[in-house]
């Protein structure tokens, strides 16, 4: 069968893992498969900088990408109420520059869709599949309808994060020009469905596939939960050839954010403790990982075939067994790519050194707050002082930590944010959070599934869905991934987080000097330039040993036990209090943590450049309060 897999706007300009893997799976069965990255054509039309704003910077729940295609999909529906909504509710996040961008981008929608239709009609494709995640829905649906009107014999199919569970069923029920919907992972279901179609057999019985009753046109399915592959080593390598061929049309200087690769699926932490705000993995949290040998072979293949320096691991969480297997194997290589991984915050220094030697240059370690009480509400399984310790250790190991401060959790103590705001100046020499924002309510998260129990009320689709989708209210609820809500106790988190948000914004805007320590002769010299001046503190003997003993967050009783015989218990307490007063020591969660960074590591860090995926093309386009984005779904981009 001749198959086209389409990656529409407004997905990021990077190789799409989901459809590229499906291309390899279908190709292995003898089918002729092409991946059409239509997002590249649209980016060329609106300009790469503006497209970057749409795909990477704009708050995803505002659905800017959906707005662009809304009046094509729902002909005659006015989008003026949506623009009014942007102007009133999201004035900070979507400034005037963004609205100017939308007007320009809107003019490119129809030419873009006609170009896409030309691409489809240039070959005799029998099956056209769309990956639809987050803000790709309306663009994909608009093109699918055009294809069906021109070539009704073509089979149209949808998959991706927007098609999980009841979202997929609502999609199929709402748009009759969509023939098939694949819910969840499609490694098994898509090849099975294509084989059945090729043989002229029924799709009934294939789990995770929604098809149409040929007589009634109604939706039919065996189960919305697909069969999931258990041994990831059986998967082929993703085929990114089409992406790089099409990417060559981008203006010189445009960059992609590394080549994506997966070494695992699911979340081993989420199997035990599902972070309350996390909607990743849909309804399946089952953790599966590739063998170290397979992971290494795939990484070698991708690095050499596509001649890339950056590999972005899309795993929800690193398989910690890799610390003793895959990563040491990688460290032995003379040339290693720069890697990004997501992991947990309770890493040890020895583990960070393994990361460093393996070429991991950036991590997202699941730091979402610096207050243990709030972290417990998130079910994160870590503490505030451990998060600060990791930030300092990342600086010393030369690893870039991506992290966030989320607020607005029901039941959180407002004074937690006052305490964090006071500590920002103490941490000014460390890497600031990417964002400080209210958490977003996503489908499948515990806060969504157990909203009443956890203190949320009036849960409804995000306002943008209601303004853009010309569908019945219940159908919109079934389609939505992002939701608005109210608090059962009537709280207003913005009111008690203003000080922290202002402090974080200042932290992000400008450099704040260093806080370092180094051995000079017999002394431990601490140099503090965080406030613009330069202050020095020289420690020797047992006092220096006490400071070094706080390299790991340590309770007072243990410090007295270790240094009391040399300094005296009272003197240990006096020194710690003095260092806390000087802000070179943090007292948090009943433990003491040295804040000064090794001076040699700090010098190396200043010379290093951020990994390419951290670059922002135009800071003037960054919204004041970008929301935290998530991604998921195998049949996704």
Residue ranges and their predicted role:
Residues 2, 9-18, 22-42, 90, ...:
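Glycine-rich beta-alpha loop elements in corrinoid/cobalamin-binding modules
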Residues 2-10, 154-157, 292-402, 407-415, ...:
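Conserved SAM/AdoMet-binding glycine-rich loop
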Residues 5-6, 13, 21-23, 36-73, ...:
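C-terminal accessory regions of radical SAM enzymes
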Residues 212-264, 522-539, 579-608:
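N-terminal [4Fe-4S]-dependent radical SAM core
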Residues 253-292:
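Canonical Radical SAM [4Fe-4S] cluster-binding loop centered on the CxxxCxxC motif
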Residues 528-565:
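Short amphipathic alpha-helical interface segments
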Residues 566-578:
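Short amphipathic alpha-helical interaction segments
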Residues 591-637:
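Short, amphipathic alpha-helical interaction segments positioned at domain boundaries
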């Amino acid at each position: 069968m001749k198959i086209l897999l389409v990656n529409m706007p407004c997905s990021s300009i990077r190789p799409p893992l989901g459809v590229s893997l499906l291309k390899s799976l279908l190709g292995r069965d003898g089918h002729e498969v092409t991946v059409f990255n239509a997002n590249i054509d649209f980016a060329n039309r609106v300009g790469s900088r503006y497209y970057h704003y749409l795909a990477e910077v704009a708050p995803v729940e505002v659905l800017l990408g959906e707005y662009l295609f809304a009046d094509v999909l729902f002909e005659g529906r006015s989008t003026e109420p949506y623009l009014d909504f942007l102007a009133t509710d999201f004035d900070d996040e979507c400034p005037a520059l963004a609205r100017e961008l939308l007007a320009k981008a809107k003019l490119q929608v129809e030419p873009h869709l006609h170009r896409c239709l030309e691409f489809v009609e240039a070959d005799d494709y029998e099956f056209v599949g769309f990956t639809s995640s987050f803000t790709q829905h309306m663009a994909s649906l608009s093109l699918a309808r055009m294809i069906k009107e021109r070539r009704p014999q073509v089979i149209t199919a949808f998959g991706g994060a927007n098609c999980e569970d009841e979202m997929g069923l609502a999609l199929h029920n709402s748009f009759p020009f969509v023939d098939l919907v694949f819910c969840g992972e499609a490694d098994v279901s898509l090849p099975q469905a294509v084989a059945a179609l090729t043989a002229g057999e029924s799709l009934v019985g294939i789990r995770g596939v929604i098809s149409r009753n040929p007589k009634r046109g109604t939706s039919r399915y065996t189960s919305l939960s697909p069969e999931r592959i258990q041994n990831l080593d059986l998967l082929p390598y993703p085929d990114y050839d089409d992406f790089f061929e099409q990417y060559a049309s981008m203006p010189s200087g445009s960059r992609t954010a590394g080549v994506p690769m997966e070494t695992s699926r699911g979340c081993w932490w989420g199997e035990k403790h599902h972070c309350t705000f996390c909607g990743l993995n849909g309804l399946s949290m089952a953790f599966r990982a590739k063998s170290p040998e397979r992971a290494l072979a795939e990484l070698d293949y991708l690095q050499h075939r596509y001649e890339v320096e950056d590999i972005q691991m899309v795993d929800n969480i690193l398989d910690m067994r890799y610390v003793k297997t895959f990563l040491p194997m990688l460290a032995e290589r003379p040339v290693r790519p720069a890697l990004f991984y997501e992991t947990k915050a309770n890493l040890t220094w020895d583990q960070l050194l393994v990361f460093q030697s393996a070429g991991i240059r950036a991590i997202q370690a699941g730091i979402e707050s610096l207050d243990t009480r709030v972290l417990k509400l998130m079910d994160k399984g870590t503490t505030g002082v451990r998060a600060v310790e990791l930030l300092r250790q990342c600086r010393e190991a030369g690893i870039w930590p991506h992290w966030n401060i989320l607020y607005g959790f029901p039941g959180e103590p407002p004074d937690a944010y006052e305490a964090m705001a006071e500590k920002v100046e103490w941490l000014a020499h460390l890497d600031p959070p990417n964002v400080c924002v209210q958490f977003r309510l996503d489908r499948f998260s515990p806060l969504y599934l157990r909203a009443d129990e956890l203190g949320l009320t009036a849960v409804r689709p995000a306002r943008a869905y209601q303004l853009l989708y010309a569908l019945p209210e219940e159908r919109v609820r079934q389609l939505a991934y992002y939701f608005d809500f109210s608090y059962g106790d009537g709280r207003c988190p913005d009111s008690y987080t203003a000080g922290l948000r202002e402090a974080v914004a200042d932290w992000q805007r400008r450099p704040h000097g260093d806080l370092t320590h180094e051995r000079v002769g017999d002394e431990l010299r601490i140099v503090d330039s965080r406030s613009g001046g330069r202050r020095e503190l020289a420690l020797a003997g047992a006092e220096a040993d006490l400071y070094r003993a706080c390299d790991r967050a340590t309770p007072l009783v243990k410090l007295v036990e270790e240094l009391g015989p040399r300094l005296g218990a009272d003197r240990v307490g006096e020194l710690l209090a003095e260092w806390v007063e000087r802000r070179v020591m943090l007292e948090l969660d009943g433990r003491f943590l040295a804040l000064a960074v090794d001076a040699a590591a700090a010098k190396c860090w200043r010379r290093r450049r951020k990994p390419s995926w951290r670059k922002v093309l135009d800071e003037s386009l960054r919204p004041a309060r970008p929301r935290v984005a998530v991604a998921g779904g195998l049949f996704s981009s």
